[in-house]
Every structure is written in structure tokens, then in C-alpha cells.
Amino acid sequence: HMAWDHHGNRLRYCRSLQPFSLELSDEMPMTGQHESSVTYPEFYRMPDGQLLFFYRDGSSGNGNLIINSYNSADKKWTGIQDNLISGEGKRNAYWQACVDLNGAIHISWVWRESPDVASNHDLCYAVSKDGGRTWEKSTGEKYRIPVTQNSAEIICSIPQRSELINQTSMYVDGKGKILIAAYWKGLGNLPQYQLVYHTGKQWKQADLAFRKTTFSLSGQGTKKIPVSRPQVIAW
């Protein structure tokens, strides 16, 4: 399965004609719905072999999270969430997902209020234990779909203009403990790498506090900044 060339573009998707083959089909739709403005496409393989496809429908500061599911028997995609996290026409969620060993899907995200990167704020969380159909908070409280700014579980409160980067990194270990890496203004009022993690009972934050150089994420478009997004590597 391939999806490519997306930043507010129509869906461009194809798949191989045979398993493991590099001979690809023509471009085709998935469900035919919400496919005119696709950004950040990601495939996730579930432990049972199910394939999920996540993407943003809409634009920076105004978009929703879509999830499709692929049935390998009839080779068809169906939509399981056509608006999981709603920006309500006012904002969008910059999300990252992780599938744990038990097949639970974890999503964390920050909100952005406008195309200005400085409008990023708050780190939020949701988890699904049934393949993406129903979602809940880390407390077990069920979400009403779509999740909105007012209903989202905020696991770390971060105000706008904190140099908060969107699309961070997340990992869930074999015991279900969650680790999220990001950066925003920390100690010394400088952008610092931050860890947000769940102990099994509560969320905690660690400011790594080793950076000495300041910078700003204010404004639109791609930024020339002195750090990269963090990645979590586990073994």
C-alpha cells in the first residue's frame, strides 16, 4: 500500500498487484469520502493483521482526523472514523499514534488555532482498545465522538506561544506505559526537550533542561530552527 505527495492535496493511493510485488495498481480512491484535502497520511498494522490509514482532512488550523480500515479479504477500505478529532472549523489536532503489543491504539496531539505555529497549545490523549471504533481517556472515561477541544483529556497544559512543536514522538511499552517526547519552553524560558509519561497511575513531566539556545516558532510555513523533533527508540 502506498500513499504519497500529500499536503492539502487529493488522496493519491495505490497498492501492489500481488503481495510483496513492486508492480503497482493505478491510483484509486479508498472510500471516496473526505479525500480532497489529505495531509500526514500514515499506515498502521494491527497485531491481528488489520491495516489502518490515518490522515488529516482539511488544513493547518482547520482540520479533522480520519481513520480508514482495510479488509484484505474483499480488498476494500471502509471508514471507521470520519471525524475522530474535530477542529470544529476553528483549529486542528497535530497528532501522533502508536499501536501497542495488545493492539490498543494510542493517540496524543497538540491543538493549533491558526496557520501560525505559535498557536500550538496543550498535549492531549486518547486510546482505543477495539481497533479505533470507540475511544477513551487514560482514566477509562469514554469519549463522545468527535473529540473536541472542550472534551479532550489534557495530559500536559501548555499555553500558546510556548514554542511547542507539533507532531511529537510516542511509544508504549509491553506493560502499557506511555512515553511522549516533544519540546516547548521549559527551564530558563528556553525551548527544551520534554518527556511526558504515564506511571500507571498518573501523568508526569520531565524537563531535560540541557539546551542553551533560544529560537521562535512564530509565523507560518516551514521553520529554520536549530533542533529536530525528538524520536523515541526502545529495545
Please tell me what each predicted stretch does.
Residues 1-235:
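Extracellular, repeat-based ectodomains that mediate carbohydrate processing or recognition
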